[in-house]
Structures are given as C-alpha cells and as structure tokens.
Amino acid sequence: MKLKAFLLFFLLSSFSLLQASDKPLIKIETERTSLIYQVADNGRLYQKYLGKKLNHDSDIQYLPQGTEAYLTHGMEDYFEPAIHIRHNDYNSSLLLKYVDHSSNNTGNGINETVITLKDDKYPVTVKLHYVAYDKENIIRTFTEISHEEKKPVILSKYASSMLHLNSSKYFLTEFSGDWAHEANVTERELAFGKKVIDTKLGARANMFVAPFFQLALDNPSQENAGEVLVGTIGWTGNFRFTFEVDNKNELRIISGINPYDSEYSLPAKEVFRTPDFYFTYSTQGKGEASRNFHDWARNHQVKNGNDTRMTLLNNWESTYFDFDENKLIGLMDEATKLGVDMFLLDDGWFANKYPRSSDHQGLGDWEETAGKLPNGVGRLVEEAQKKGIKFGIWIEPEMV
C-alpha cells in the first residue's frame, strides 16, 4: 500500500514538473525590480508582472497570465502590435511561439536574458533581449528579427520594447520645446485610446520633442514618492513611443524606431537589430528614477564616468558675437579666479571677407577674424596656458 502511494505521488510530481517545464517562467530582475514572463498553454509568451521586486517566488503563482509580451499583427488582439511584417506571399500575419531562452551573467552586476520566439508556419525568428543592470535598477531591451523565406521580408514595424502595466490611473510626462526653449514639461492623465510621442525629423529628431518619457502610476508624479517608470531610446533618428489604454484600463507602451517611412527589406538569414530601449522602475518617485539613470550612465556609458568632471566657462552667453582679444582675455582672468578648468571660445571667431558677426551669416571658413583676433587663436591659447587653464574652441561640421 505504501509502495502504491509512493508511486502515485511520484507520478503526480513528475507530471507537475513536466507541465512546469512546458511553461517556463522567465525572471528578469534588478535589486529593486522584477519583470516576469511565462509561456502559456498555447505556447506563446506573456508578461505576468512588472513592478517592485517580488521577494518570494511563491507570490508568482497568484499573478494573472497577463498580456502577450510582444504582440503581433493579424492575431486576436485588437490593439497596437509591436511588430508588423509582410511575408513573400504578401500575408502580414505573424504568430510567435516560445522556443527557448538563455540567461548569461556578464559580470559587473549585468545579466542578459534572450528569449527566442518563432512562427510555426513561416520561418521567422524574433529574439527579445533584456539586459538587467542590477545595482543601477536599469533594464535595456532590444529585438533581433531574422527569417529564412526565399525572398526578402518587408519589416513595416519593429519595436525595441513592449511593456504592459495595470494600474488605476496613468500620468504621462513628456518634454517638448524648440531652440532656446527646450524641455518644457507637460503631465497629463491617459484615458482610453492612444497617446503618441514621436518625431519625423530624422537627424534633428530631438528638435521639438525629447526622446524620453516619465509615467506615474495611480497618482501624478512626485519627487520622492510613488511608482514611476522612466524610459528612453538609444537612437538619434526618428523615434516613437505609443501609450495605449485598452478596454480593461490596461496600458501598453511600445517604443522604438518610428515606422513612418521606415520600411526595411530584410534579406534571408540576415539579422535586423533594433535600437536599445532603456527603462527604470521606481517606488520612490521620479527623483529615484532620475538617480538610477545617473548611476547607470556614470558606471556603464560615459567614458571615465566616475572621474571628477572639468568645469568650463564658455564666452557665448557673456559676449555672443561681440568680442575681441582683450575682452576674451578678461573673461579668462575671471574664470581663473573662480577656479574654472577650461575656457572655451564659441561662435564668431572666423572669416574675414564675410566675418561671422550674427547668425544671419554663413559659418564661414577656418580663418580667424583679424578685426577680433589680430594675433590669432594662438595668442588666446598662450594666455590660457599662462593662467593654468585649458583652452577649447567651438567648431561645426558645416564650416568650409
């Protein structure tokens, strides 16, 4: 009798383990954030959770299935997809199912998880990459798309990231402006439907709108309290952030290259890699979120990021185009008294036939304007050296 009971227990346990292995649970975590995915019975990947780090794995079993992680065009979901492609037969539907995943600790508190998805009818593969910076509480995401169809596949839309949130209210902060009037802050509550932050200006992508956003949950954002998600994209061209609240008051955030005029013909067996999207989740307001990005930039992105930074005096706001040698040397004297490390000469130092004396004139050439600098830039460099400060100079690629 005991043997039969043991065998029954063993078989039930084995069956449970087999079921669990068929539906892998994938955890992407930092010290303070959990992003959790799970494969459902239909073989597709769902985001179960994004928020404050879960301290006990047992909590996961009480989470709902969630929403499909990387929504495709042409399936049962009625809202904005993360990817839209056109196959060789002109069909544009895509059904991505889980294949496998891997996780690799690259050292220095960085862990990369790669989730591979494939369509079971078309030979299309999508790999979702998540790089978690443990101490800094930053997650970097990007997507790789490849295929083995006979002819090139047309990529119409290819998001770097798709995130799902479930809260009572959502408050979006965006930053817009113009020259000398940058980063004006606007916060608004999101309602059913879409809100888009985007640009179509190409190389001037951040001219009117900044490529980052701040999203507060439940209440308007505060400096030191409340849940906030901040995101940005590592891309200097056209970008788009789409925020869509659905009929269940759930929010999806799709981030990446702006699909406007951005169709890409992808040859077989080549890999298309999207730009990186970075985000941080904070339970201590936008102040903590900002500091997370500062820490990440110093530790992982900016060259010598933890070194002492130089202080600089730029003559532009003091003089604009109205300066001469003596005025600049006087500014250097004041900079030295203040302990400034570098003096930088800005616009207006070049051209003689058509000297640059206002922004209505061209950017000229590489000749110093004799009327302003009779002894050339060399004299200014010598004066800076005498005073023990560094010398810098402003140039633009348009100068001819």
Please state what every model-predicted region is.
Residues 70-99, 218-242, 281-302, 341-347, ...:
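Glycine-rich, aromatic-flanked loop segments that form ligand/cofactor-binding clefts
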Residues 22-36, 44-244, 260:
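Polysaccharide-binding surfaces and accessory modules of carbohydrate-active proteins
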Residues 40, 148, 158-160, 348-350, ...:
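An acidic- and aromatic-residue-enriched active-site/binding cleft used to recognize and process polar
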Residues 1-23:
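Bacterial Sec-dependent N-terminal signal peptides
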Residues 20-25, 247-267:
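Short acidic, Pro/Gly- and aromatic-enriched capping/linker segments at domain boundaries
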Residues 32, 91-98, 264-283:
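Short Pro-Gly-centered flexible turn/kink motifs
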Residues 266-267, 296-309:
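N-terminal amphipathic alpha-helix/helix-capping segment at the start of soluble metabolic enzymes
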Residues 304-400:
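Aromatic-lined carbohydrate-binding/catalytic grooves of carbohydrate-active enzymes
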